């Protein structure tokens, strides 16, 4: 089904196309986490004798291999026609996000693709891509706690809340907090699409909460320090 998301998005009846945007320096878990949730959902649904599910494709400029920030290289397909309907467009974060959002052609593709997507989802600093494309003007969003102040400073029209694990920013846009929060959001989207039983089955398989208790400030506190014991400024310098 992966090819369906490129050559004919959503052509298989009942299958929801998921297109994940990759770029140099993307955070690997921001890509792989949601992909694992959506593909697991398809497996659960097949086990129930259902034909619906998700067709997941990772795409990049020119279909070039994606060098992630952790050194893993991901295979990718070329960017699909942005005018073709997509169910879910996923915008991951990573230390390469500034380079990606400074690419006017990529942002132009993103803006048009989002117009034809049922929903657009950002993970971690992928919120900067969404903001750069004007997808969250006047909306409340979240991002990785260490980058919330920077996002708010750069995009005055966006209200940034550093606490939630994810936010439904508008009727068509969702934003998730840092890194693993993309898994939480993907589970919520699956639950919204096909029900709690499927989402709960996936959560058990992944050995995680279906609904994580608390927000992300519990991981930043006290004094907004990162898990590595460094300040947000040092964190950004190291990982952004």
PLM features: residue spans?
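Extended, subdomain-level signal for the structured scaffold at the beginning of enzyme domains
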Residues: 1-120, 129-132, 191, 200, ...
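Membrane-helix boundary/helix-loop-helix interface segments in multi-pass membrane proteins
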Residues: 78-79, 151, 175
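Membrane-embedded alpha-helical core segments of multi-pass
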Residues: 90-91, 159, 181-182
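Flexible, glycine/proline-enriched loop segments at strand-loop-helix junctions
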Residues: 96-99, 136-139, 173-177, 188-189
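Structural detector of well-ordered beta-strand residues that form the stable sheet scaffold
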Residues: 120-121, 142, 161, 174
């Amino acid at each position: 089904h992966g090819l369906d998301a490129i050559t004919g998005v959503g052509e298989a009846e009942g299958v929801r196309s998921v297109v994940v945007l990759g770029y140099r320096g993307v955070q690997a878990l921001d890509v792989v986490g949601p992909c694992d949730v959506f593909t697991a959902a398809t497996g659960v649904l097949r086990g129930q004798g259902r034909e619906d599910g998700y067709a997941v494709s990772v795409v990049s400029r020119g279909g070039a291999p994606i060098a992630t920030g952790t050194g893993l290289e991901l295979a990718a397909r070329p960017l699909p026609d942005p005018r073709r309907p997509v169910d879910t467009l996923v915008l991951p974060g990573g230390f390469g996000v500034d380079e990606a959002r400074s690419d006017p052609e990529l942002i132009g593709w993103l803006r048009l693709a989002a117009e034809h997507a049922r929903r657009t989802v950002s993970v971690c600093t992928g919120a900067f891509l969404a903001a750069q494309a004007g997808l969250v003007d006047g909306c409340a969003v979240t991002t990785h706690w260490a980058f919330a102040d920077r996002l708010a400073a750069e995009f005055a029209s966006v209200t940034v809340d550093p606490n939630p694990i994810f936010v439904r920013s508008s009727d068509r846009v969702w934003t998730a907090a840092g890194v693993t929060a993309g898994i939480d959001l993907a589970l919520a989207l699956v639950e919204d699409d096909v029900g709690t039983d499927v989402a709960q089955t996936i959560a058990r398989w992944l050995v995680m909460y279906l609904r994580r208790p608390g927000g992300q400030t519990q991981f930043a506190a006290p004094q907004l320090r990162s898990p590595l014991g460094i300040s947000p400024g040092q964190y950004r310098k190291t990982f952004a």
